[in-house]
Each structure stands twice: as structure tokens, then as C-alpha cells.
Amino acid sequence: MAQQGSGYQARYKRILLKLSGEALMGSEEFGIDPKVLDRMALEVGQLVGIGVQVGLVIGGGNLFRGEALSKAGMDRVTGDHMGMLATVMNALAMRDALERANISAIVMSAISMVGVTDHYDRRKAMRHLNSKDVVIFAAGTGNPFFTTDSAACLRAIEIDADVVLKATKVDGVYTADPFKDPHAEKFDHLTYDEVLDRKLGVMDLTAICLCRDHKMPLRVFNMNKPGALLNIVHGGAEGTLIEEVQQ
């Protein structure tokens, strides 16, 4: 586990970290790369070590995508329920990685899964966070048609997080896909309305509107950059910050 930091004051006391399921694949084309899990667990452990309370939401796209199968004829609700189960699988894998690194963690699912996870309870989640446990929120919102990005923003608001940190493969929000357009320009700051007006695709409409309506700051950053997460928590300007008014 990470050692206690000295000489540093964390800017955020409580964060909600959103990881995509694809981030867990590493260099694989499907599933979970244990090396990626272990690296992420150590980075989260560094935050716990300096007293930051961490909530986690992990997508399920590395295992299943309900929307894609719905286009092929599967009932959308059934597909979304299967996607929720994929997020539970990822959450269990992350909990295991954290516990192997001697970091206390709990999985709370929006769908009751007695004997596998705890059922989501806001007050219980807050108690665990205050006890320095990492709380992994699984199964999205528990409802079909809602993305895990929306679930992350919802949980962040419910637990009174200071910020939503969305980990991606690129170091922020760009005018276009930087992998496809070499002339794409990066934004350092944006407002929620700018994200919506420009249709930048940072998150879905529901997620962005939730953050805007509840004044929840959102930072998009590159999780593959070593030390980026810790730098953000210390107040570093990694990636793109989205908030109500630019500072």
C-alpha cells in the first residue's frame, strides 16, 4: 500500500473515479489484464495513503456492450442488464486487486446480489468512505438506458464528492478525436454548456446535465500517464477541467 505522503496537502478530500471497462483490457482485445488492475490499485492506494476518500465506478465495455447487441436485435433492457452484470465482474476484480495491495475495499451493487456484493446504500457507503475504505459502485444506476458515466455522476453527487475524475486514453478533451485528427486541439478548461453546445462527446447528455445542475466539477485525464491521478489530487492541471465557471 502507498505510504503516507508528507509535505503535501490534497486539494480534494473525496473523489469519484470513473474508469472505462476498456481501460482494464490493457493491450488485450477482451477481458481484464491483471497487470493493469494491479497498477490502478497502487495508484488508488497512493490516494488513500494521503487521506483521500475514493469512490470508484467501472464500466463494462471490456466484457459486454448491451447497446451493440440491441442493434443486432436483442431486447435493449436485457442487454443493459447484462452490461450491468459485466460492471459487477469488473468491480469484483478491482476489489481483489485492491485487497491484494492491502487496501480495504467494498463493492456496492445497484442490483441486489446477496452473497456476492453489498447492496448500494448511500449512508453505508458514506460510513465506509469515512473509514478510508475504497467504495466500488457496481451495476450502474440499476436501471436500463443509463450509462455508467451517468451512474458515476449520480454517485458522486450522492456521496458529496468534490470532483468526478474520468480516466480515458487521452489527456483531456479535444476539438476532435486526436487519434484521427492530428490537428485536434486540446481544451484546458470548459463549461458544461460549452461541452453540450459543441457536442464534444465527453459524456452522455444525462451525465453532463447532472454535473451542471449540481455544480459537480468534472476532470478528464489520461489514466495511462504515471502519476497523473496523484497530481490531480494535489491540485495539478492534468487533462481538461469542466465546471460551471472557468477559474
From Swiss-Prot:
Biological classification of the source: Bacteria, Pseudomonadati, Pseudomonadota, Gammaproteobacteria, Pseudomonadales
Binding site for UMP: G60, D80, T141, G142, N143, P144, F145, F146, T147, T148
GO terms for biological process, alphabetical: 'de novo' CTP biosynthetic process; UDP biosynthetic process
Subunit structure: Homohexamer.
Location of this chain's protein in the cell: Cytoplasm
EC number: 2.7.4.22
Residues where ATP binds: K18, L19, S20, G21, G61, R65, T168, Y174, D177
Any single Pfam family the record assigns to this protein: AA_kinase
Name of this protein: Uridylate kinase
NCBIfam families, sorted: pyrH_bact
Function in brief: Catalyzes the reversible phosphorylation of UMP to UDP.
UniProt entry keywords in alphabetical sequence: ATP-binding, Cytoplasm, Kinase, Nucleotide-binding, Pyrimidine biosynthesis, Transferase
GO cellular component: cytosol
Organism superkingdom: Bacteria
Reaction equations catalysed: UMP + ATP = UDP + ADP
InterPro entries with a match to the protein in the record: AceGlu_kinase-like_sf, Asp/Glu/Uridylate_kinase, Uridylate_kinase, Uridylate_kinase_bac
Principal subcellular localisation of the protein: cytoplasm
GO MF annotation: an example: UMP kinase activity
Regulation: Inhibited by UTP.
Pathway entry: Pyrimidine metabolism; CTP biosynthesis via de novo pathway; UDP from UMP (UMPK route): step 1/1
Family: Belongs to the UMP kinase family.
